[in-house]
């Protein structure tokens, strides 16, 4: 073994000890996988991964995405040796207020690129980052090119999302994407061969990947594989590293305690191993398991100096490029800062009485010409979810050509959403992804991580109600609005509502809802109709100006001097309330109609504004095409809500409107009954 390799093995053993010690101290966690993966992460971080140690947010750094978040001790230990976590941080694993949570949460300044935990999502986010890198390089040059590395486990390969990642990365020929598969044949409750017998290498080769199989504990083989991955220009690379779970673990009698299912998800001592003997076997001090080896200090100090030299050279290249491309440099700065171009939303022409998905297409057409760093994706529905309003003015990504701004994800909603998260994590782009609202069920795990990570991803969900019609109940969302609006009640770690959910009521409001969506910093859902909706009336002269009040979450669209009742809805039901209000007015019953596109946004307004829109002491009536609970917080326990508490049926939507009572006559009758008239 060469001197360099022997030092790297010592570093890897240091990471094994630190990982096991962290879990022992926390009395919970996953030591075995971290001990098995230590060799690969050592070589990657000490010889290949390029970043600026003095500016961890350097935009053109290589990215490392950890998919199996339960292996966080391995990542934290490595980053601690690199100088980004303290010993105290490691000793606080999984404790209240620590910066080392059980599963990593995005913390770029310490080297954590992504929040991970739900298996499969991490490497799908890495795919998104790799696509974003190609998008940026296509516009500003290969001087900013960088690699995206993903670390996956057997569990991620088993997760269905791996199909989407494998297919898309291979199809697009993402040679900047390198994935390490830690194959140790162990998972939480079984050995892998008890649940999977497929040939993983052949599967990825069929998808068009460059597949390399190595001994994941052999420093030379790891290095050679990473060199080969760096030189690959046509395909993404999968390195299959065959490793040993609990590498170096010893039992009470000094016997090997490697390759055991029991060491996957609990401290070594709880699994039956001898922690002190394990530390000693790995060359450490059982009395001081958090000690940093001299070899680790030396290797990482040398790497830090090499990285600083690399960063200085990169800075010089960028400086020269900026001097020669001043206009492009300004655009790059706008991309990275999130600065948006000036857009006159009031001048966007909109036909009357359009479906809000069609209105969205019009806005996206404007964005395609104005917002150069927006990437729009669709899961094989662009001509139905109307994201084709964007596509018609650009083109989709293809292998070797990322000059367009559209990502055809194919039928893979969860993968698409995770890819959008990865794009947002990479930075410099605004990701948008569209599909039918009912298929948001496939996306919820990724939407949840969007909210947890506070990522600016825009979800366009169309065909928002039973008015999908003839396709029937499998395609008619009923409970979905209630589910996604719960995210407005769930607060993120910045004490904000973790998501903004907007269901605009007509074409003009859709325009202004899009304005909110692109100016946000959190994830946004736009829930849009399949069918045409009548343009709402105005209290003043210009509907578009009144629609701008969507920024307050809710506002009055039709009023009376002394309303006997307040009628509340979102989306297409607002127009139905207007129809009912006109019938009531003809009978001498004055009412107010309130449109609440986002209850969360509305509740964030001053109480005085909320009370001016929904005055106390006035009867309230609500209509929703979803579950009645959608409006319970606005209507109150004493009000009446017309909603659905059952699945839909297959029939033309106008027939369903009649059968389910979604018309002005029903509104008028139910309001009169509520008022005792």
List the predicted regions and their residue ranges.
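Thiamine diphosphate
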Residues: 1-147, 298, 302-527, 532-533, ...
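Small/polar loops that bind or transfer phosphate-bearing groups
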Residues: 66-67, 153, 214, 378, ...
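DG-centered beta-turn motif at the end of beta-strands
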Residues: 128, 146-159
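Conserved beta-strand elements of the Class I
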Residues: 149, 375, 566-568
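Residue-level marker for buried hydrophobic side chains located in beta-strands
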Residues: 150-151, 179, 377, 621
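Active-site metal-binding loops of divalent metal-dependent hydrolases
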Residues: 153-156, 243, 381, 436, ...
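Non-catalytic, alpha-helical, charged scaffold/linker segments
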Residues: 278-312
């Amino acid at each position: 073994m060469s001197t360099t390799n022997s030092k790297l093995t010592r570093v890897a053993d240091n990471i094994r000890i630190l990982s096991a010690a962290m879990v022992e101290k926390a009395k919970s966690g996953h030591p075995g996988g971290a001990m098995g993966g230590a060799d690969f992460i050592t070589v990657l971080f000490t010889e290949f991964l390029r970043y600026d140690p003095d500016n961890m947010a350097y935009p053109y750094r290589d990215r490392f995405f950890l998919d199996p978040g339960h292996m966080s001790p391995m990542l934290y230990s490595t980053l601690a040796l690199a100088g980004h976590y303290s010993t105290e941080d490691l000793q606080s694993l999984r404790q209240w207020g620590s910066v080392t949570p059980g599963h990593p949460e995005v913390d770029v300044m310490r080297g954590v690129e992504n929040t991970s935990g739900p298996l499969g999502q991490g490497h799908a986010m890495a795919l998104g980052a790799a696509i974003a890198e190609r998008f940026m390089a296509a516009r500003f040059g290969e001087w900013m090119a960088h690699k995206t590395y993903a670390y996956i486990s057997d569990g991620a390969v088993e997760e269905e999302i791996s199909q989407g990642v494998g297919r898309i990365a291979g199809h697009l020929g993402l040679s900047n994407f390198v994935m390490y598969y830690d194959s140790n044949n162990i998972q939480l409750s079984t050995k892998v061969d008890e649940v999977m017998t497929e040939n993983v290498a052949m599967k990825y080769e069929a998808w068009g990947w460059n597949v390399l199989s190595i001994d994941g504990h052999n420093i030379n083989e790891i290095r050679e594989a990473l060199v080969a991955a760096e030189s690959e220009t046509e395909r993404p690379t999968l390195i299959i590293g065959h490793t040993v779970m609990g590498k170096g673990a010893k039992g009470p009698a000094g016997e090997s305690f490697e390759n055991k299912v029991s060491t996957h998800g609990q401290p070594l001592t709880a699994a039956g191993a001898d922690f002190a003997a394990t530390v000693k076997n790995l060359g450490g001090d059982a009395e001081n398991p958090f000690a940093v080896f001299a070899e680790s200090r030396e290797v990482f100090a040398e790497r830090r100096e090499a990285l600083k030299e690399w960063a200085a050279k990169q800075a010089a290249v960028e400086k020269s490029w900026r001097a020669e491309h001043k206009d492009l440099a300004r655009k790059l700065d706008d991309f990275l800062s999130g600065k948006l171009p000036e857009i006159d939303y009031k001048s966007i022409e909109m036909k009357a009485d359009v479906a809000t998905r069609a209105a969205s297409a019009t806005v996206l057409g404007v964005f395609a010409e104005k917002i150069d760093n927006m990437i729009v994706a669709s899961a094989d529905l662009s001509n139905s979810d109307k994201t084709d309003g964007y596509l018609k003015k650009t083109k989709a990504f293809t292998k070797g050509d990322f000059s367009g701004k559209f990502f055809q994800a194919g039928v893979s909603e969860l993968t698409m959403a995770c890819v959008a998260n990865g794009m947002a994590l990479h930075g410099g782009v605004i990701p948008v992804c569209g599909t039918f609202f009912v298929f948001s069920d496939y996306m919820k795990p990724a939407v949840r991580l969007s909210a947890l990570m506070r990522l600016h991803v825009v979800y366009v969900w169309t065909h928002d109600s039973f008015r999908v019609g003839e396709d029937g109940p499998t395609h008619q969302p009923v409970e979905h609005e209630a589910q996604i609006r719960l995210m407005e009640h769930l607060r993120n770690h910045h004490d904000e509502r973790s998501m903004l959910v907007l269901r605009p009521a007509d074409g003009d409001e859709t325009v202004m809802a899009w304005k909110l969506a692109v100016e946000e910093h959190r994830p946004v859902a736009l829930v849009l109709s399949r069918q045409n909706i009548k343009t709402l009336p105005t209290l003043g002269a210009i509907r578009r100006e009144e629609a701008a009040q969507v920024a307050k979450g809710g506002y009055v669209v039709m009023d009376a001097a002394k309303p006997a009742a307040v009628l509340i809805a979102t989306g297409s039901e607002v127009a139905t309330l207007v129809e009912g209000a006109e019938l009531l007015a003809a009978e001498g019953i004055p009412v107010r109609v309130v449109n609440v596109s986002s209850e969360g946004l509305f509740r964030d307004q001053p109480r005085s504004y909320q009370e001016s829109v929904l005055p106390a002491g006035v009867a309230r009536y609500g209509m929703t095409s979803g579950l009645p609970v959608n409006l319970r917080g606005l209507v109150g326990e004493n009000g009446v809500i017309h909603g659905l508490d059952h699945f839909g049926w297959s029939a033309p939507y106008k027939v369903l409107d009649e059968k389910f009572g979604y018309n002005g006559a029903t509104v008028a009758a139910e309001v009169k009954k509520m008022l005792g008239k």
